[in-house]
Amino acid sequence: MSRLLDVMERLRKDCPWDREQTTESLRTNTLEEVYELSDAILSGRPEEVKKELGDVLLHIVFYSTIGEEQGTFDLCDVANTLCNKLIYRHPHVYGEAVAASAGAVVERWEELKQQEKGGNKTVLSGVPASLPTLIKAYRIQDKARGVGFDWEQPEDVWTKVDEELRELREAITSGSAEDSEAELGDFLFSVINVARKYGINPDNALERTNAKFIRRFGYVEAKAKEAGRSLRDMTLAEMDALWDEAKRLESQP
C-alpha cells in the first residue's frame, strides 16, 4: 500500500492527466471500473477479479490523495472512519449484543444507521438516487422490509404479480402509452419482489440471462457466417433452429 501511495504521489506531480483530475472528473470513470469489476466477478476468473479490484483501489487512493492535497482527509482517515463504522454497527461482535441470524444483523445495522443520523433520516433516504433502477427497486423493497412493510408469505407476491400483469395487459389494450409505461413499471417492481422474497438477486439473474442470450445469438451469427448467409436474409425458423442447436450444445456435459 505504501508503494501505491508513492506511485500516486509521483503521478500527481509528473503526469499531466493525473495532475488535472478532480473528484468530479473521476466519478464516471469510477462507475465504469465498478461495472468492470462486476463483469469480472460474474466471469468467475480470479485473475480478472484481482486486476479489476486493483483498478477500483486506484480510484479510492486517487480520491484520498486529492482529499489530502485539499486538507480535508487522507487514506488513513478513510480507513479509520470505515473501521469505526464497522465496529459500531457490529455490537454482536464488539459488544454484548446478540444476533441470532444474518437477518437480525441487517436489521440492527439499519437501526444503528438511523441512530447515527439522529433519527431524522427517513427509511428510504439511504437509497442512492443514482443506483441502476433494478438494483434501486430491490434496495427500496429491502429497506421497507426492514421496518416490517412486506408481504407475510412469499406466495402473496404471486397474487400481486398476477394483478399487475392483468393491469398491464389492460393498459396496453387501451392504447394509452402513459398508462402502459406506469403499469409495466408496477409489474417489473412486483417481479423484483418475487426475486427478493425467494432470495434471488435479480440483477445477477438478469445479467446471466443477458450473457446467455449473447452467447446463443453469437452461435447463430457464427453458423450463419459459416454458411455464407446473412441473418437478415434468414427466416425466423432457420434462426430458431440454430438457436435450439446452441441450447442443446450448452446442455451437453
Regions found by a protein language model. Name each.
Residues 1-53, 58-184, 188-253:
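Flexible "arm" and connector segments at domain edges
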